[in-house]
Design a protein with these regions (language model features):
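A carboxyl-terminal module marker
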Residues: 2-91
């Protein structure tokens, strides 16, 4: 079981359900849970923007997850969030 967190800056119209849908479509095999642990709205994000801090739980039922697999999974998720939800990843 592995947890990885991302902070995504999104338009205020983007819902948690949209984040979950994109994540599940991207990583059905090893993604076990997607949950938001913080929502932030502030002037420094820009007009009409909000930041979701999202936790992803990854687990492979058949083998131990390697750093390489985890990194590739998170890269795919980030790419999909950027393309489909116009997300900006907060560092």
């Amino acid at each position: 079981l592995f947890r990885s967190d991302l902070s995504l800056v999104l338009d205020q119209s983007v819902t948690l359900q949209a984040i979950q849908r994109v994540a599940e479509q991207t990583e059905k095999a090893i993604l076990k849970n997607v949950s938001v642990f913080d929502v932030y709205v502030g002037k420094n994000l820009g007009e009409g923007k909000k930041s979701y801090s999202v936790s992803f739980i990854l687990q492979d039922e058949n083998q131990t997850l390697t750093d390489k697999v985890i990194d590739a999974t998170m890269d795919r998720l980030i790419t999909r969030f950027e393309k489909e939800l116009n997300a900006i990843i907060r560092k």
